[in-house]
């Protein structure tokens, strides 16, 4: 039975999803899914890992996010977070770009901060401009939440989405996690969809790859809520209902709504795209009148050539070859930006130096970005930028750590806060903190938590602790 999962969370839905993107892709392939969407909460953090794994496995990927609406404050420490959800799927690269823009806006607007994005539906619809497919959501979706107050409220919420995003861009989502009202709610939602000539789609709203991750998912929920598993008992599902399912399982689960299962394949085909097709858009470059970015870059490089190489014909030919490729690939603006940042640092007496494969570029050397002469040392430019590779150039520049903030603020001021970003690693659990949090979730005392976390540093606790965890709590007991 063909089926594509359009609602799936990875471990990048922090303390909510229990499987990494690669495991989700592998499981989707094992189940024979036609496509898999990654829709982590309020972020696109896992899409690169997802896309790379899916490409290696030949799986179609859909990129989206589940947006949190009406969140008054960060929801860690809350058993059942407040607010509603809006599931967004990007329709191709342009939809992806617009989704990234909306997510950025949500954290930069007044009141937005880590754990508390501020989304406004009117603004989201304006940003989307027809480039998103919007699902009404699972139990946290405004339409499904509206059913609690009756069909009129649910219908009002559905009409609002249709008015904002367009009838061709809204899908009614059916999910079944075996809650007492799920079957009835799905029937009502299907009736609403029919009444408004909308398609339904069936989803798992998956939070882990397989049933074996269920206990971990429950433990993560307890950690997020800062409660023990016993205290979370009323909020946790009775079994591994949020796992990826095959098309046959979904057809059986939604036997009264088989069209909702069938529709997922067409939606996946319409929204899937290769992440590599997305290219960064550089901020506009201010160059002197009468110049384009490439002509100004050639001018600056010519000045650098005279200072660094004089009339050396080998260097002149090398620079001409590099500049032709840079022009052909449309990267002149990138070199101008890096050159400008380095020039600022040097003018302020801030120590800086380019490194890595950029040292193989005579253009970088002529601009003063790097200090190694690639012509003298015979370094091949192709190591840095090649016509045979589709990847963008990557110039790494180290700045004096004590004055790095000055450079960052200069970049923000000149290019705009929304045109610059800092890259950071995602912090993951170390053994000591993992043991401490799991022990707390399992209801052990503070003293036991401390003792086990200390033992984890001695590298003796892993398997023993897991066995104790299993003996202490099981969702099936």
Predicted feature descriptions by range:
Residues 1-457:
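Phosphodiester-processing cores and adjacent nucleic acid-binding clamps
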Residues 462-477:
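Positively charged, low-complexity/disordered segments
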């Amino acid at each position: 039975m063909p089926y594509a999962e359009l609602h799936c969370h990875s471990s990048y839905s922090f303390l909510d999803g229990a499987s990494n993107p690669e495991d989700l892709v592998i499981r989707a392939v094992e189940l024979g899914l036609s496509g898999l969407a990654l829709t982590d909460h309020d972020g696109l953090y896992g899409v690169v890992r997802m896309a790379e794994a899916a490409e290696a496995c030949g799986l179609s990927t859909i990129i989206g996010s589940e947006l949190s609406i009406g969140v008054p404050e960060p929801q860690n420490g809350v058993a059942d977070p407040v607010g509603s959800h809006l599931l967004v799927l990007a329709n191709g690269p342009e939809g992806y770009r617009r989704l990234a823009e909306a997510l950025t806006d949500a954290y930069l607007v007044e009141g937005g901060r880590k754990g508390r994005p501020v989304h406004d539906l009117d603004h989201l619809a304006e940003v989307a401009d027809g480039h998103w497919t919007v699902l009404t959501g699972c139990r946290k979706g405004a339409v499904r939440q509206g059913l609690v107050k009756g069909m009129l409220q649910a219908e009002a919420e559905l009409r609002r989405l249709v008015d904002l995003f367009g009838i061709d861009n809204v899908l009614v989502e059916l999910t079944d996690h075996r809650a007492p009202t799920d079957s009835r709610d799905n029937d009502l939602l299907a009736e609403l969809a029919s009444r408004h000539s909308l398609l339904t789609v069936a989803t798992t709203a998956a939070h882990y790859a397989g049933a074996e991750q269920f206990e971990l998912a429950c433990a993560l929920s307890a950690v997020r809520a800062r409660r023990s598993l016993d205290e979370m008992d009323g909020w946790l599902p009775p079994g591994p209902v949020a796992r990826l399912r095959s098309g046959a399982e979904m057809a059986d689960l939604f036997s009264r709504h088989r069209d909702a299962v069938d529709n997922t394949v067409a939606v996946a085909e319409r929204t899937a795209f290769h992440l590599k097709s997305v290219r960064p858009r550089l901020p506009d470059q201010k160059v002197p009148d009468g110049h384009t970015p490439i002509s100004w870059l050639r001018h600056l490089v010519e000045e650098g050539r005279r200072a660094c190489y004089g009339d050396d014909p080998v260097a002149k030919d090398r620079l001409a070859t590099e500049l032709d490729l840079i022009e052909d690939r449309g990267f002149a603006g990138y070199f101008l930006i890096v050159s400008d940042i380095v020039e600022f640092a040097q003018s302020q007496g801030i120590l800086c130096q380019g490194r890595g494969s950029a040292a193989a570029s005579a253009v970088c050397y002529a601009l003063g970005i790097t200090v190694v002469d690639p012509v003298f040392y015979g370094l091949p430019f192709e190591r840095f930028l090649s016509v045979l590779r589709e990847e963008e150039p990557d110039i790494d520049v180290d700045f004096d750590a004590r004055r790095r903030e000055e450079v960052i603020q200069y970049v923000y001021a000149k290019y705009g806060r929304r045109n610059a970003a800092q890259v950071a690693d995602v912090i993951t659990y170390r053994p000591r903190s993992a043991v401490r949090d799991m022990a707390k979730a399992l209801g052990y005392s503070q003293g036991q938590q401390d003792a086990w976390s200390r033992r984890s540093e001695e590298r003796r606790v892993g398997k023993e602790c897991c066995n104790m965890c299993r003996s202490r709590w099981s969702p099936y007991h």
